[in-house]
């Protein structure tokens, strides 16, 4: 089975627990296995389901109690430097570094990934075009709006042309226009790479997403095409994604 799944981005048998005062260790993820496909996937789950934890493990910002993450032939434990160079992560609480321009902020992301100064600068210029911020390249990044700063974060994830992008609640707190713009960017960048976007908001899931994965009770409860997930909703549902999600996590039909 694993030989068939080794190509691509694979979480394999991941277990992760957190210690909570007076409660001991509480399991967040339990022997979770998931093969994230090429294209844009919505990682859907209620608050506290472990979505941020799963993405953090995928970016090697957290290490699981057991299991591993692999990208094609690379193992996140044994080949961490090479693995990190091909995976980009935008945490939910993205903030611009004070004092840096937009271009400098994006180039800094490339430098952190091991790119040379010249390559980082060149990559930043190209990435800003992809997120439609080239006209603001020399503005202080900290002066941009929340939606614009999220796009700076996305450019930082794109600067080294990563094969996998892990975006944690990237549209949280944005107005409808900014959300729509961000989803349009996802369509443009997701054609030839793996993009995983976490969300708890079923209303956020549109045709910008090709796939849906539902994280519930420590494991992936659904993994498939968007249309297949919507088809699980009761007949006549006005909000099929929401209905399918609620039915899945409550066990109701």
Regions inferred by a protein language model and the residue ranges of each:
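Helix-to-loop junction immediately C-terminal to a conserved catalytic motif
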Residues: 59
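Conserved ABC ATPase "signature" region
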Residues: 107, 111, 118-136
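A short, flexible loop at the N-terminus of ABC-type nucleotide-binding domains that lies
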Residues: 2-11, 15-31, 80
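Conserved ABC ATPase signature
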Residues: 99, 140-144
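Conserved ABC transporter NBD signature motif
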Residues: 67-75, 82-83
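Catalytic Walker B motif of ABC-type/P-loop ATPase nucleotide-binding domains
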Residues: 165-169
